[in-house]
Amino acid sequence: MVTMIAPSASMTIHPVRTSGTIIAAPQTYQYFERLQERIVRFVTKHSNITRERFLALMMDTQDLASDVGSVLYGEEAVACGLVGRLGGLSDALEALYELIEEKKKKSE
């Protein structure tokens, strides 16, 4: 699998949240916890970032003003293993065409 991010792109990693009114019950908290766990499992399964590092970025209180989470820019996302490599649109298209050719060769 190929994952790519533009050098000038940014991504925000933060805990699951909602806007608006919610019912303040233990079940609501458990629902958010389960939803967040599914996201963490998906991201760590499909990238090279460890669960511990991803959670640390998600819960960081030093990066965002008056909020929890982290902002990563292109090179940082690659360095921590969240994204495979840097690239722009032409790089992504080239990778796509390579994957198509590989699939064609396998089916022959």
What do these predicted regions represent?
Residues 1-108:
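N-terminal organellar transit peptides
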